[in-house]
């Protein structure tokens, strides 16, 4: 979600690359917010699910690498960093390699929301170091509505922040990431609720008011 807070035209270089040195592609991607540079292994799936790729290239033009003989274990230095620097200098994306179909980019499976008239089903997609449960349910589905989280047998009412409930109590609110968050005031929601990444979360919408 952090990409949304960067200036328009930012070049985002990201390298989580267990397949470095294999046949996986390095890619440069143009999207509405700027550019993405990194391995084609699904790393950019979350961003592209919100802001689709406008164009993409396979970074196979070695003229724009740091060296034509890159390390088999350090493409972040020898390919991706160099390409990002050339983009920053104004080199067009299309000069950096072969144009590819954006639909061919590798995508990780991202949980699909189930939306009904009075309920939304999502899941936990991240747990931070404090034990807060970050879900994939976005704020715009909840804003202006009377909602609560159903964790049988618990019903967690919507609040604004941690301190809206006593210390040790569970609270649900729209977090700083822009989506539903479940937390415990001065505690860990993960430890108290025994939930993990991928576990289902159901929100009930009260339309009687």
Pin down the residues of each PLM region:
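Active-site histidine-anchored catalytic micro-motif
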Residues: 1, 6-9, 14-16, 20-78
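Anionic-ligand-binding alpha/beta catalytic cores of soluble enzymes and soluble regulatory domains
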Residues: 66-136, 141
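Structural motif
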Residues: 10-13, 26-28, 34-37, 54-58, ...
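Surface-exposed interaction regions enriched in Ser/Thr/Asp/Glu
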Residues: 197-206
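Fold-independent oxyanion-binding glycine-rich loops
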Residues: 15-18, 31-32, 39-41, 47-50, ...
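A generic local secondary-structure boundary/capping motif
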Residues: 3, 25-27, 47-48, 70-72, ...
């Amino acid at each position: 979600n952090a990409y949304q807070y960067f200036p328009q035209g930012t070049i985002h270089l990201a390298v989580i690359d267990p397949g470095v040195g294999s046949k996986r592609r390095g890619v440069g991607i143009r999207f509405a917010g700027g550019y993405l540079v990194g391995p084609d292994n699904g790393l950019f799936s979350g961003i592209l699910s919100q802001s689709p790729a406008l164009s993409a290239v396979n970074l196979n033009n070695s003229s724009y690498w740091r060296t034509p003989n890159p390390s088999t274990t350090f493409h972040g230095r020898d390919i991706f960093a160099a390409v990002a620097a050339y983009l920053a200098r104004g080199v067009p994306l299309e000069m950096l390699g072969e144009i590819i179909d954006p639909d061919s980019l590798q995508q990780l499976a991202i949980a699909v929301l189930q939306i009904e008239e009075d309920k939304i089903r999502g899941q936990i997609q991240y747990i931070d170091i404090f034990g807060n449960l970050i879900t994939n349910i976005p704020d715009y589905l909840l804003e202006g509505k009377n909602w609560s989280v159903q964790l049988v047998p618990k019903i967690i009412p919507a609040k604004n922040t941690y301190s809206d409930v006593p210390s040790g109590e569970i609270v649900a609110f729209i977090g700083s990431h822009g989506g539903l968050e479940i937390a415990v005031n001065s505690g860990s929601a993960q430890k108290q609720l025994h939930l993990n990444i991928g576990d289902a979360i159901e929100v009930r919408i009260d339309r009687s008011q």
